[in-house]
Amino acid sequence: MQKITGETVRDDFNSINTVLHYTRAAHAIGLWKSERAIITRYLPDRSAEILEAGCGAGRVAVALRQLGYENVTGFDFSSELVEQARNLAEERGLADLIFHQADATRLGDCRPIADRSFDGVLFLFNGMMQIPGRENRRTALRELHRVCRPGGHLIFTTHDRDDPREAAAWAREAELWARGEQNPRLAEFGDRYFTDDNGNTFMHLPDRKEIFEDLAATGWVHVNDRMRDELASETPKVRNFSDNCRFWVARK
């Protein structure tokens, strides 16, 4: 059976149910309290050049512009979501907000991004973990490192496989992998692929050790990491939209 690939994930993100899910969130939820807290702490300059990877339907990029950040550029590899992001920006009177279709593992293919450098880079709502394959995720980290200015920050989120509430589930999953009985479409321990009302979703759930190793291997210096509920008490709407996650901050 064919493994989950980047093309699989792109097709899933272009599906109507997934596009509707992210578009509704962009219109109705906006910036989380935790996102605002960590972004304004590590990127306090409202004139900073900010690149948002995996911008989806524009939820974060549009909210940052409304918060006063003047130079935000977003990209996503889903053409359907990029179109929705542009529509949202236009509806909010931000037609000059720039969105590109681009692949985080191949930023050199998008000259408007590849030819620039940024003060900070964001990859929120666990977007980096929706890239199948650890080496591919490391490639994305290297690409983001390349377009980030020295001293600039990377802020991203992941799930946390070390969460004690998940221990029993991961113990069972480890037994399946030991017997070779895991989902044959998954390539690495920590991968999940599931279907719900919002469509198909691939997600890699790392432990902290994995992220520390990946940052070190790609030139980033770890600065901070905190669970979302340590940063802010989110609204019920946000908690219904997204599980708790770990925020990571790294510096070039």
Locate each region found by the language model.
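Conserved class I S-adenosyl-L-methionine
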Residues: M1-D45
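Class I SAM-dependent methyltransferase "Motif I" SAM/SAH-binding loop
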Residues: G54-G56
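Class I SAM-dependent methyltransferase SAM/SAH-binding core
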Residues: R59-G108
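A short acidic, Gly/Pro-enriched loop at the edge of an enzyme's catalytic core
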Residues: C110-G120
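A short SAM/SAH-binding and catalytic strip from SAM-dependent methyltransferases
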Residues: D119-E135
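A short glycine-rich, Lys/Arg-flanked "PGG" loop and its adjoining helix->strand segment in the class I
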Residues: R138-P150
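SAM-dependent methyltransferase
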Residues: I155-L215, N224-A232
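Core SAM-dependent methyltransferase catalytic element
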Residues: P236-K252
